[in-house]
Amino acid sequence: MEFVVKSAKASTQKTATLILPLGENCQLGSVAQSVDSASAGALSTALKRGDIQGKPGQTLLLHGLPGLKAERVLLVGTGKADELDSRQWRKVVNAALAVIKNLGGGDAAFAMQDVQVKGRDSYARTRLLVEIVADGQYVFDQFKSKKAEPRALQKIILLCDKAEQAGVERAAREASAIATGMAFTRDLGNLPPNVCHPTFLADQARQLSKAYKGVKLDVLDEKKLRELGAGAFLAVSQGSDQPGCIIVLQYNGGKKGDKPYALVGKGITFDTGGISLKPGLGMDEMKYDMGGGASVLGTLKAVLELQLPINLVCLLACAENMPSGGATRPGDIVTTMSGQTVEILNTDAEGRLVLCDTLTYAERFEPRAVVDVATLTGACIVALGSNTSGLLGNNDELIQQLLQAGESAADRAWQLPLFDEYQEQLDSPFADIANIGGPKAGTITAACFLSRFTKKYPWAHLDIAGTAWTSGGKEKGATGRPVPLLTQYLLDRING
């Protein structure tokens, strides 16, 4: 998908479809009024028929209006001006996209420059529009014998005021990169687990390191992990015939000597629960348990597309959690890379086991801050549903940076407490720590566990169990979240 920014008049723009906003009660904005004048009042005449009222997401497609170079005009309702927020804006853009992607002509022009979205300037409004349109074109049909028909829509023209053109161009460029990262994340998540295993993810990382400059790859195999004393990680991977690994990607786009930011992703490519076996219903969706690792790779891809001037290290904790004669048992005690011992009471609480050793390994990079991303707990879905990611950590400034990034990127998170009182739930009579803390506050106690291994740097934990994929039905599939949040967080570190 190509995005082109122009400061041309809407009435003189040659395009297959010109998209114009329509406010509540058929209110035409300044741009739409100029188009109405150029077409000898054709818009006003069409509105008198009462086919559209301007409510959010309503559409009316008009053909062959006089005086215009556009073949069609699509009116899209934006509702009441004082109620148009990011959520409504998404509804508006998706409504337009639903129409234009089924039309011929190959292009469409958005003339939305006079629309005001609460809390968003022209840059932020445009960036969200481009992300929605690009992500809305996503198709996953790699394993279909009959592929989807090629999309007719190939180019989007973004009309803007001359004074805002530079900002809109930057928005389109950044949004396109984020959408590319989201698509990569979605592809990895949607792949079947017999294809996407730890070695496959390492191969994907290798291809990424070869495709872009400034990237260094290191894959820590199980032999190396044994040498490092990664007993918690190996306790998870030992039940599978697929060997586990920690994938380390270093991108040095910033100044030499600047400490890097670090992203750590949970990459459990299939989670049966191990000996603590999950129920069979819905287990197929446990291929998405590598959503944290996939989103870290997707974020890195967005960073590489933009060649951001930042130093970044990405670590993926990749393993399968399978039952077998060699699998870890409930009650086993292992020694982590940090030297702390863990009593494994439930083998289905495996994500924190691979993450704790990976978080310890991250210390050697002396990071400015570490953000780990994981489909960690079902409890987070109970608490926050599928709209919002859970956020916890040991540094208030970092937490606020991530919350703000989520708001800016329309990919929101919500902070949960990490009070010391919760730590007591992880007490074990036989080891330093247990890997579960009972039925209460599951998301919090999982983060409490990770906090034991993150004392040497500012750290935050994103629980994306509810946001990484859409469960069941025709819309089932990976979402690409939280690539927008993470990319925005890194952009803010540069711009800040």
From Swiss-Prot:
Cofactor: how and how many bound: Binds 2 manganese ions per subunit.
Keywords for this protein: Aminopeptidase, Cytoplasm, Hydrolase, Manganese, Metal-binding, Protease
Cofactor(s) the protein requires to work: Mn(2+)
PROSITE patterns linked to this entry: CYTOSOL_AP
This enzyme's EC code(s): 3.4.11.1, 3.4.11.10
Family to which this protein belongs: Belongs to the peptidase M17 family.
NCBIfam families in alphabetical order: PRK00913.1-2, PRK00913.1-4, PRK00913.2-4
Protein name per UniProt: Probable cytosol aminopeptidase
Protein encoded by which gene: pepA
